[in-house]
Amino acid sequence: MISKTPKVFSVPNLTLLITLLTISTILIAGCGSGSSEDDLFPQISDPGTVFTLDEVLATPYKELNNYSTDELPGATEATYGFMRIGGGEPYDYEIRVYDSHQAAVDQGTPMALEGSGENAILSEDDATFKEGIKDRRTIIGGGTGGGARSGIGPKFATYAIFGNIVMLCQGSDAETSLERCGLMANALVPSE
């Protein structure tokens, strides 16, 4: 009868095996599909096109309200609505149109900051652009029961400027908002 002795790894072979497994794990983790900041839609970009409200309305965007721009310096149009892509969830947007990309950046940025983000001004008494302020609010709060969801917070976590358009895009965080701004930009310029 032949006796079989178990194979024993020598220390150098075991060290080599552990090193190779560690390197493989690092390489696989490094090539993961997680999103990075490079994948985010840029907050300010200029495709070289001056868009009109009619071009926005020609996308899957559905207008719910058209706002007066009297309190919105430099804006020629302002609209609130939603867009649904491929039968998915609808996302709310506030779109503000300016004469140029530079006007959108110079005049639109302060007002976009006022209407979006964790420091958004959501009170008519304090806001500069009062038109549609209720559309920029959302009910927040966790838990169950009627009183658990009683806070008011910003519907738009951030904004993006795409050409001459300032977009406030629905999202609970800046990354989600920018992703949804990217959906609108892609609807305007499908090759973007």
Model-based region annotation:
Residues 1-11:
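N-terminal secretory signal peptides that target proteins for export/translocation
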Residues 13-23:
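Sec-dependent signal peptide hydrophobic core
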Residues 21, 111-112, 188:
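Alpha-helix boundary/capping residues
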Residues 27-30:
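C-terminal motif of bacterial Sec signal peptides marking the signal peptidase cleavage site
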Residues 32-85, 178-192:
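N-terminal "mature-domain start" segment
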Residues 39, 127-192:
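A short, solvent-exposed beta-edge/loop patch
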Residues 42-49, 88-91, 101-104, 170-178:
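Solvent-exposed, acidic/flexible segments
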Residues 53, 57-147, 151-152:
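Short, solvent-exposed recognition patches
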